[in-house]
């Protein structure tokens, strides 16, 4: 029974990340929340014929200068890394966090889904989709753009990270239980 833990790290963009997690689990957009509180969500997701019990730990956020706790590395099999398309700085921070994760895993291939959130705010866009695609390709990761407000691809993000884990590990194992951070 392999333990699959997925980590969602989102520096400086707590509203976008939290709203994405809440939209995925609760099916509604979260306007207000406390960004300093770590939250846990659970949801059952079906991929093909398999059922996965996802446990999402919505972290209070990290920045490029933070020391990553071992809980973000040890026993974690996949990551959803989210930045805001309206913030170039958040995109740059995600690059730095990925490098720390990659080094922490011994530079092995990581199942990662890179998500450009807030796609509904196109007039305020600072990061073009092509930049996200290029960065994800350099990592061997999947790239998606989403909008928590419009519920655009929120389910697909978590389905994709499960598929990425399976692809990298080449096996789902007997029990499909995912812990998301």
Swiss-Prot record:
Residues where lipid is bound covalently (S-farnesyl cysteine): 178
Residues bearing PTM Cysteine methyl ester: 178
Protein name as it appears in the record: GTPase RhebL1
Family assignment from sequence similarity: Belongs to the small GTPase superfamily. Rheb family.
Annotated GO CC locations: cytoplasm; endomembrane system; plasma membrane
Name of the gene encoding the protein in the UniProt record: RHEBL1
Motif (Effector region): 33-41
SMART domains: RAB, RAS, RHO
Keyword Membrane: yes
PANTHER family found in the cross-reference section: RAS, DI-RAS, AND RHEB FAMILY MEMBERS OF SMALL GTPASE SUPERFAMILY
Segments traversing the membrane: none
Keywords: Cytoplasm, GTP-binding, Hydrolase, Lipoprotein, Magnesium, Membrane, Metal-binding, Methylation, Nucleotide-binding, Prenylation
InterPro entries assigned to the protein according to its UniProt record, in alphabetical order: P-loop_NTPase, Small_GTP-bd, Small_GTPase, Small_GTPase_Ras-type
Function, in words: Binds GTP and exhibits intrinsic GTPase activity. May activate NF-kappa-B-mediated gene transcription. Promotes signal transduction through MTOR, activates RPS6KB1, and is a downstream target of the small GTPase-activating proteins TSC1 and TSC2.
Binding-site residues, GTP: 30-36, 61, 117-120, 147-148
Reactions catalysed: GTP + H2O = GDP + phosphate + H(+)
Quaternary structure note: Interacts with MTOR.
EC nos: 3.6.5.-
Subcellular location: Endomembrane system; Cytoplasm
Protein origin, superkingdom: Eukaryota
UniProt GO BP: small GTPase-mediated signal transduction
Gene Ontology molecular function: GDP binding; GTP binding; GTPase activity; metal ion binding
């Amino acid at each position: 029974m392999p333990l699959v833990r997925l980590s969602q790290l989102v520096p400086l963009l707590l509203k976008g990340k939290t709203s994405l997690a809440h939209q995925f689990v609760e099916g509604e957009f979260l306007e207000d929340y406390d960004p300093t509180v770590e939250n846990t969500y659970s949801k059952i997701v079906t991929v093909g014929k398999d059922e996965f019990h996802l446990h999402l730990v919505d972290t209070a956020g990290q920045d490029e200068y933070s020391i990553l706790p071992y809980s973000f590395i040890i026993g974690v099999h996949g990551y959803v890394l989210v930045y805001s398309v309206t913030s170039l700085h958040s995109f740059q921070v995600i690059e730095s966090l990925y490098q720390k994760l990659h080094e922490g895993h011994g530079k092995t291939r990581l199942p990662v889904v890179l998500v450009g959130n807030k796609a509904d705010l196109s007039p305020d866009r600072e990061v073009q989709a092509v930049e996200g695609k290029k960065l994800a390709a350099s990592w061997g990761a999947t790239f998606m753009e989403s909008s928590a407000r419009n519920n655009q691809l929120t389910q697909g993000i978590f389905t994709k990270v499960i598929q990425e884990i399976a692809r990298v590990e080449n096996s789902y194992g007997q029990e499909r239980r995912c812990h998301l951070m």
